[in-house]
């Protein structure tokens, strides 16, 4: 039941846009510190009714089917203290621009949490690819060493949930994956340690230019007290002299790189820290050079936190990677089936393909992000036996493959189920070492997110294996 007196006192209103997880916990936290909170949700479905009731019992007014437009806010704009927006809303949205011109604070859920968590140690991880693995692995290593270091931000639990439950008082380190969308709406967040994993063309439908995208990522590192970069990434390496001073890692054995870098792996699998052996890498389950880069970034951060080489090494032996990232879902003597649904762009797909030896058939498709695909096609020409395409981008990708000189078989389908029926027929007549699900595109043409897409793929594979 909503307290009408609470709603009549409309001064210092905090308007939260969106009933997603982060919006809900931002609203709950703000209300718990006696802020007046209103939530607007643009959709109007049955799935929102239960949470609407729960929030209204906390004296949070929830309006469904309410568009985020300035004319709806203008009548009570003088009473607005802040507007908390979802990362999915572009920062150049017309309403956001007008609100900022009026001096209204426009932030995201992470910035809301920062206001109470800023006295806690923070590690902020960003990058086009690799940031989720780095976030999860670093959190694992710190937690294995009796530090409470939850992973949060773009993955895991919304930080406002910790603020709401008072659990933040026990946190030793916040390990936050921060997308470019989240960095834009978290201007006050200043991590103790900032990590930049990779930088390649992505999200240009949102950021318009590569320079804008780069500068958003860069801003997080500039605000960090201590910075860690990936020298193997050519775009970061090319900005070596212009980026804020920090620690660099490399997996290259080219000794000329060691002058610029602080961490690398030698030819005997020893982790090297500033020219000295830290420990020998013996138990690390993740495939590919890109995951060795991720590991070195994590080691550099863990060392800055204060962990010994032995403690880091011991923590690696029981690490289990997150699903949908080069996830082996079936393996026998003849065939391995890998789910890499997290490969939502061409660079991520290339990294996965290059980590596999032997004959590959690949499944790709989804919604294109406007990326350049020439390098991806060149890798396919060298590494795969044939390609199966599905979804919204299938026709565009087929033409791109043909135009780039891909001479092997291309099969095109609208949906995964039909595609996999043909794939299993193909496998009966062709010997292939690996079936790789590497969409190279976003999932939004047919799925809510890459997790749903990956789960759907795994379900279909499970059904096919039972039949076959």
From Swiss-Prot:
InterPro entries assigned: Folylpolyglutamate_synth_CS (IPR018109), Mur-like_cat_sf (IPR036565), Mur_ligase_C (IPR004101), Mur_ligase_C_dom_sf (IPR036615), Mur_ligase_cen (IPR013221), MurD (IPR005762)
GO cellular component terms given for this protein: cytoplasm
Keyword annotations of the record: ATP-binding, Cell cycle, Cell division, Cell shape, Cell wall biogenesis/degradation, Cytoplasm, Ligase, Nucleotide-binding, Peptidoglycan synthesis
Pfam families: Mur_ligase_C (PF02875), Mur_ligase_M (PF08245), MurD-like_N (PF21799)
Claim: Coiled coil is one of the keywords in the record: no
One BP annotation, GO: regulation of cell shape
The keyword Cell cycle belongs to this UniProt entry's keyword annotation: yes
GO terms, molecular function: ATP binding; tetrahydrofolylpolyglutamate synthase activity; UDP-N-acetylmuramoylalanine-D-glutamate ligase activity
Binding sites annotated in the UniProt record for ATP: 127-133
Reactions the enzyme catalyzes: UDP-N-acetyl-alpha-D-muramoyl-L-alanine + D-glutamate + ATP = UDP-N-acetyl-alpha-D-muramoyl-L-alanyl-D-glutamate + ADP + phosphate + H(+)
Class of this enzyme: ligase
SUPFAM superfamilies assigned to the protein according to its UniProt record, in alphabetical order: MurCD N-terminal domain (SSF51984), MurD-like peptide ligases, catalytic domain (SSF53623), MurD-like peptide ligases, peptide-binding domain (SSF53244)
Entry EC number(s): 6.3.2.9
Pathway the protein takes part in: Cell wall biogenesis; peptidoglycan biosynthesis
Signal peptide start-end: none
UniProt-annotated location(s): Cytoplasm
NCBIfam families for the chain: murD
The family this protein is said to belong to: Belongs to the MurCDEF family.
Role summary: Cell wall formation. Catalyzes the addition of glutamate to the nucleotide precursor UDP-N-acetylmuramoyl-L-alanine (UMA).
Protein's name according to its UniProt entry: UDP-N-acetylmuramoylalanine--D-glutamate ligase
Species per Swiss-Prot/TrEMBL record: Prochlorococcus marinus (strain MIT 9312)
């Amino acid at each position: 039941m909503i307290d009408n007196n609470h709603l009549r006192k409309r001064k210092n209103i905090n308007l939260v846009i969106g009933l997603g997880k982060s919006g809900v916990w931002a609203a709950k936290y703000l209300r718990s510190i006696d802020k007046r909170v209103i939530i607007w949700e643009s959709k109007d479905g049955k799935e929102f009714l239960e949470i609407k009731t729960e929030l209204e019992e906390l004296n949070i007014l929830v309006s469904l089917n309410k568009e985020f437009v300035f004319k709806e806010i203008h009548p009570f704009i003088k009473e607005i203290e802040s507007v908390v927006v979802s990362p999915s809303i572009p920062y150049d949205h017309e309403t956001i621009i007008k609100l900022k011109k009026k001096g209204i604070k426009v932030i995201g859920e992470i910035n809301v949490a920062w206001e109470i968590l800023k006295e806690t140690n923070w590690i902020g991880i960003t990058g086009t690819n690799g940031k989720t693995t780095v976030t999860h692995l670093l959190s694992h290593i710190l937690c294995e060493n009796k530090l409470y270091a939850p992973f949060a931000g773009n993955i895991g639990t919304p930080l406002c949930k910790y603020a709401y439950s008072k659990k933040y008082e026990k946190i030793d380190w916040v390990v936050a994956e921060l997308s470019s969308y989240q960095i834009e709406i978290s201007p006050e967040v200043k991590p103790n340690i900032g990590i930049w994993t990779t930088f390649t063309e992505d999200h240009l439908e949102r950021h318009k230019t590569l320079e804008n995208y780069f500068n958003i990522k860069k801003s997080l590192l500039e605000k960090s007290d201590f910075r860690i970069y990936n020298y193997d990434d050519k775009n970061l390496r090319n900005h070596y002299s212009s980026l804020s001073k920090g620690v660099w890692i490399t997996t290259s054995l080219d000794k000329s790189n060691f002058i610029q870098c602080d961490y690398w792996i030698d030819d005997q699998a020893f982790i090297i820290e500033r020219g000295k052996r830290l420990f020998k890498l013996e138990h690390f389950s993740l495939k590919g050079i890109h995951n060795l880069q991720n590991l070195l970034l994590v080691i550099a951060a863990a060392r800055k936190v204060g962990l010994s080489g032995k403690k880091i090494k011991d923590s690696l032996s029981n690490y289990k990677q997150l699903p949908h990232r080069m996830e082996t879902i079936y393996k026998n003597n003849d065939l391995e089936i890998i789910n890499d649904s997290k490969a939502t762009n061409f660079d991520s797909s290339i990294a996965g393909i290059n980590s596999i030896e032997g004959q590959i058939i690949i499944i790709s498709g989804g919604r294109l992000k406007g990326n350049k695909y020439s390098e991806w096609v060149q890798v396919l020409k060298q590494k795969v036996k044939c390609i199966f395409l599905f979804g919204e981008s299938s026709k565009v990708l087929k033409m791109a493959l043909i135009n780039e000189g891909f001479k092997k078989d291309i099969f095109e389908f609208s949906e995964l189920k039909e595609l996999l029926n043909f794939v299993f027929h193909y496998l009966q007549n062709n010997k292939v070492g690996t079936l790789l699900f590497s969409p190279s595109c976003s999932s939004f043409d047919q799925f809510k997110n890459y997790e749903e897409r990956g789960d759907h793929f795994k379900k279909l594979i499970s059904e096919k294996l039972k039949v076959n």
